[in-house]
UniProtKB/Swiss-Prot annotation:
InterPro entries: Apyrase, Apyrase_sf. Salivary gland (at protein level). It is found in: Secreted. This is Apyrase. GO terms for molecular function: apyrase activity; ATP binding; calcium ion binding; calcium-dependent ATPase activity; GDP phosphatase activity; nucleoside diphosphate phosphatase activity; toxin activity; UDP phosphatase activity. It is an enzyme of class 3 (hydrolase). It comes from Cimex lectularius. Its cofactor is Ca(2+). Belongs to the apyrase family. It catalyses: a ribonucleoside 5'-triphosphate + 2 H2O = a ribonucleoside 5'-phosphate + 2 phosphate + 2 H(+). GO terms for biological process: negative regulation of blood coagulation; proteoglycan biosynthetic process. The keyword RNA-binding does not apply. Its EC number is 3.6.1.5. Residues 1-35 form the signal peptide.
Length: 364
């Protein structure tokens, strides 16, 4: 199913008030006139493949990268100072990789955090940003409340694409959780779990769809239900058990998908138990999902921490991963940064960043 939500399509995203509707109309008009942000005129498909956007510095077998993380602060994203405004925290830092030993260190630019703002919301919530990814020369981030895909530039966000839930024929925005580039297209996924009632009854399979976006902003909705079932079956999990995804990447080097589940359980989903069902495993799958293999990650962790995002370290031939692990328990949020290789060997123990819930990381 193919649909383009970039330029002037019928509005499928229903705000909860007139102001929101007017704002969305304005943004769609803006996107129609100014799609230049991704560097394409209509019909162009030439790619900008520079990654990372900031050139790494290598000296004495040590490589330094600029790295960034962005937050999903849920209900706390609403601005306390400006009306009809929602805010996310964007934090950058320097990551150093010592090639000879694979030692990873990171230094955050604490005190220089940027507050990224938007007026767009759904149901009174917005700017709950769940991913950070470079695509076609731009840094993108994804609001899991509105379904908006933003371009992040100069510490400001500009809407690019609106993703509708499930098969694309829904008035609700898609709950984006992860995104990765494959074969020149951007794949955007959700939790990969059936949407159920509190009693465990399945209401829909919308989170088991994936969006494929080309460089012109055209969206194709893909039914990944079978793929997600195969991923969780690698851990002997079947419904009503579940596996919740927020972190996935495609590797051209291995021609495989890699998933770091946020949480998993043999039992039915329970919102309270979810807080302590954090996973600590890498799952790799071939392109057709015919074979999925789990690898346990070594090192110390806690059950309340689960992966919210990860990226391969550039120039490491996709052998080294840096990831975010978040905590959401009893109104407490925290984010930890870690690094490890594909065999599960920890190269940087889980180290706390701060009390924001960062759900997107990339080399910027």
């Amino acid at each position: 199913m193919r649909s383009s939500y970039r330029v002037g399509n019928p509005i499928r995203f229903q705000p909860t008030n007139v102001v929101g509707l007017l704002l969305l109309s304005l943004v769609l008009s803006f996107m129609l006139v100014q799609s230049y942000e991704l560097g394409h005129a209509s019909g162009e498909t030439n790619a900008n493949s520079k990654y990372p956007l900031t050139t790494p510095v290598e000296e004495n077998l040590k490589v330094r990268f600029k790295i960034g993380v962005i937050s999903d602060d849920d209900k706390n994203a609403v601005s306390k100072d400006e009306s009809n405004t929602w805010v996310s925290t964007y934090l950058t830092g320097t990551l150093e990789w010592e090639k000879s030993t694979d030692k990873i260190t990171v230094q955050w630019d604490k005190g220089n955090e940027k507050k990224v703002k938007s007026k767009y919301s759904y149901g009174g919530r917005g700017m709950e940003l769940s991913e950070l990814v470079t695509f076609n020369g731009n840094l993108l981030t994804f609001d899991d409340r509105t379904g908006l895909v933003y371009i992040l530039k100069d510490d400001k966000v500009y809407p690019w694409v609106v993703l509708a839930d499930g098969d694309g024929k829904n008035s609700k925005g898609f709950k984006s959780e992860w995104a990765t580039e494959k074969a020149g297209n951007l794949y955007v996924g959700s939790s990969g779990k059936e949407w159920t009632t509190k009693e465990g009854t399945i209401e829909n399979y919308n989170p088991m769809w994936v969006k494929m976006i080309n460089k012109n902003g055209e969206v194709t909705s893909l039914n990944w239900q079978t793929n997600y079932e195969k991923i969780r079956s690698s851990m002997n999990i079947t419904f009503p058990g579940y596996m919740w995804h927020e972190a996935a990447c495609w590797s051209d080097k291995y021609n495989k998908w890699f998933f770091l589940p946020r949480a998993l359980s043999q039992e039915a989903y329970d919102s309270k138990k979810f807080e302590t069902q954090g996973a600590n495993v890498i799952i790799s799958c071939d392109d057709k999902f015919e074979k999925c293999e789990p690898t346990q990650i070594q090192g110390k962790t806690e059950d309340k921490r689960g992966f919210s995002n990860f990226k391969f370290v550039p120039t490491s031939e996709d052998k080294i991963i840096v990831g975010l692990k978040t905590v959401e328990a009893d109104d407490t949020t925290e984010t930890y940064f870690t690094a490890f290789d594909l065999e599960g060997k920890v190269l940087l123990e889980e180290t706390k960043i701060d009390d924001h819930k960062y759900e997107g990381v990339d080399f910027v």
